[in-house]
Amino acid sequence: VNTLTHHVNTLAEHILAQDSDRYLVGIAGAPGSGKSTLATELSRRLNAQGRKTAIVPMDGFHLDNAILDARGLRPRKGAPETFDAPGFLRMIHALKSGDEVFAPTFDRTRDIAIAGAVAVPAAARVVIVEGNYLMFDEAPWSALAKLWDVSVRVDVPMPELRARLIQRWLSLNHSSAVATRRAEGNDIPNAQRVIDRALQCDFDLNGQPARNS
């Protein structure tokens, strides 16, 4: 069984044992750790088992580039202060209430957030939220910790994160030099900050692929 399948098995077993009308799963971790992949596979498994599940990415709460430019924050895009944290907190409270919620998402290719792109119906019994700062020991993000019914961290060693973050820029057709500069100038410091200020999670998972076994 590969690492991802093992993690999905573990989490799905735990979640399916809960009898709740609305169960919030917070998947935290550094950029490039594999949060989105885990969220997608876990959602697929839960839906296949008859537990209606939705995914909400924290990335939809990126502040627009025009606002970041006005505040001199564009070079730090992805750092905690470049997100609408109060808006994100309000949405998490709305999700906990069990109501239908429309959430934004982020288009990485166009580098823009898209409002109302994710519909979370009232019938969704599980909502998987994934993002860098879901279990993060800096205000106002630290207020999120008590809102998750279960918290999950995806842990990846820094050398692997570095390679993935450079590859992310390469996949957007940047040169090797630009990709490396962007990753090392911003993404990697953000990743280190996530690691340094991490709060204890209910599940701590190794996000490295299994070395062939």
Where is each model-derived feature located?
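Conserved nucleotide-sensing/catalytic segment adjacent to the nucleotide-binding pocket
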Residues: 54, 63-110
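Hydrophobic positions on the alpha1 helix immediately C-terminal to the Walker A/P-loop
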Residues: 38
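Small-molecule kinase domains that catalyze NTP-dependent phosphoryl transfer to phosphate-bearing small molecules
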Residues: 114-116, 141-142, 167-213
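ATP-dependent NMP and nucleoside kinases share a basic, alpha-helical "lid"
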Residues: 110-168
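Post-Walker A helix-loop "phosphate-sensing" segment adjacent to the P-loop in P-loop NTPases
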Residues: 44-54
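Conserved lysine of the Walker
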Residues: 35
